[in-house]
Amino acid sequence: MEVWWKRECLRVDETKLFSALHRAHHQSAFRANVSSVVAAQTFEASGDLSKAIAAAILTLGRKHAPLEQTYQFLSMEEPWREVPGMLKRGAKVPGWGGTFQRDKPDPLWQEVDDLLADIWPATYIKISSVTTTLIEHGKTLYPNPSAYTAAVALVLELPKELVSYLFIGARLAAWSMIAQKQLTQEGVG
């Protein structure tokens, strides 16, 4: 598969990972997360899909999808070693914890997790070691979509400054479907 950020095409295993990431993001977008809620509300208020998508994108960052911070964290050789200090300072570990899956790993992201474990063990070890360290320090937190998106960006050699492309590109269809559903509901009401 050709991608715009690399000279060479993605290998078959990389294409599988890219596709799995897209599927997981698409499914995740139908939850009441902040970007999807803002997209729906903006479309309802404006009737303009472009504004709804722009508003959804503007929610990305520090609290919702801290993609660049998570990428930087997972770029460290041993990110799990940073966790105790982060917790001591009261800082959040970017890419861990979530609104929808608090007590166990998110099943929507299992395919991405499995592919990382099977084909990119070094990346998977970083993720699982951070999770283990959090649990050892009394924080039952699991990787969220930001962690998986950043991990895939690292594996596919997408620069940190462009990691949001994976998130946005994978959620565009879902955000559009959310808007279309509102149009259908308005026509009925």
Which residues are covered by each model-predicted region?
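Non-transmembrane, aqueous-exposed alpha-helical and coiled segments at domain scale
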Residues: M1-G189
